[in-house]
Regions:
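Conserved, well-structured core segments that form the ligand-binding/active-site neighborhood
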Residues: 1-138, 147-151, 156-187, 192-195, ...
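Catalytic core of carbohydrate-active enzymes
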Residues: 144
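Long insertion/accessory domains within large nucleic-acid-processing enzymes
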Residues: 220-228, 232
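Redox cofactor-anchoring modules in respiratory/redox and cofactor-processing assemblies
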Residues: 226, 255, 260-264
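Active-site capping/gating regions of soluble enzymes
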Residues: 232-233, 266-268
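Conserved small/polar residues in nucleotide/adenosyl-binding loops
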Residues: 331-334
Length: 334
């Protein structure tokens, strides 16, 4: 995971970065690229650089990244940016002074290490998720939400992510976030350890004991596999199937094509997934039924779509509580 490199912002802020007049180079690969970046960069001194042969764009310089020479390719781009600094126009520079603290970098290994820090090494087994399971079993934490996905220019940016997270943590539901959703949380201060004061009594106590924020940053949106590995570890340590865990996924502002594959991965793994933007399947009632009900026969999970954020979070909490009491085989999670 990234080390020592602060986040500048998420998807819908990429043009704003250029507008500061302080961006020597903006580098993209193949995803979530605004088409206006090329002409916008020409209005400033910014170099717009693409790195993939399948995503070359007008008004861009192309530097192909190869696995064998990636380090040298990166150094060449950094040198271009350094050399371009002299072309910065002071009269066009405006750097906002808004900053927010965030604790990031919670891989599966990092989370297990945090959990080891609150175990009794003389009695308890280390290197497992059992301390977290004990919190869930006792009801101190009700469950977890994997919050993933984009900002969407069709709706108010970040609002859904932030409001959903606030209500979840207030109801003692820990949030694991990635990608643009995680950056929305960071900007709102939800990844600062002081955000524990927004939590319910149970989650607040856990945050204090483990010295963590209530919203954990787990990487980019395509790091969804980390979340699924964590879910698999929880299921293994609990002796349950993944679709029995009191865990849900959510992409309240999804926009990108990759969000479709990420969502299908989560549902296919057995975790109910909640969307705040309608998927483009309304032309087929059969497809709509398949996604919202049919997949449950195969994986034990399906999509729920609700564009009203207040109703969406209530449905998420309701599903988590249902999971806690759904089967006699795991009534210890009540």
């Amino acid at each position: 995971m990234r080390r020592g490199v602060p986040m500048a912002g998420n998807f819908l802020q990429q043009e704003n970065v250029v507008l500061t007049g302080a961006c020597e180079a903006i580098v993209v690969d193949v995803q979530c690229i605004f088409p206006a970046l090329g002409p916008l960069s020409k209005c400033f001194h910014t170099k717009f650089i693409t790195t993939s042969p399948i995503a070359q764009m007008p008004d861009a310089e192309f530097i192909r990244f190869n696995a064998e020479t990636a380090g040298e390719n990166a150094k060449a781009i950094v040198k271009m940016a350094i050399d371009n600094f002299k072309n910065r126009k002071p009269e066009l520079v405006h750097i906002p002074q808004l900053k927010q603290k965030a604790t990031v970098g919670y891989s599966v290994e990092a989370i297990v290490k945090v959990l080891d820090g609150v175990t009794n090494s003389q009695v308890d087994e280390t290197g497992t998720t059992k301390p977290l399971l004990e919190c869930i079993t006792s009801g101190v934490i009700r469950g977890a939400v994997a919050m993933v996905g984009c900002n969407n220019p069709k709706i108010r940016p970040d609002y859904a992510h932030i409001e959903l997270m606030k209500k979840c943590i207030a109801n003692d539901i820990v949030v694991i976030a990635s990608g643009c959703s995680a950056q929305a949380a960071a900007k709102a201060g939800l990844m600062d350890k002081s955000a524990k004061d927004l939590c319910g009594a149970g989650l607040k106590r856990v945050c204090e004991l483990a010295d963590i924020p209530p919203v954990l940053h787990m990487g980019s949106c395509v790091d969804i596999s980390r979340m699924m590995i964590l879910a698999a570890e929880l299921a293994k340590d609990a002796g349950l199937q993944i679709n029995q865990l009191p865990v849900v996924g959510c992409a309240p502002e999804w926009m990108s094509e990759k969000a479709v594959s990420i969502g299908n991965y989560v549902v296919g793994t057995g975790i109910d997934t909640f969307l705040g933007v309608d998927p483009y399947v309304s032309g087929s009632s059969e497809m709509g039924e398949l996604l919202t009900e049919g997949t449950r026969k195969w994986t034990g999970a399906a999509y729920t779509v609700e564009t009203d954020i207040e109703k969406l979070v209530d449905l998420m909490i309701e599903r988590i509580e249902e999971k806690r009491t759904a089967s006699v085989s795991y009534t210890h999670l009540r």
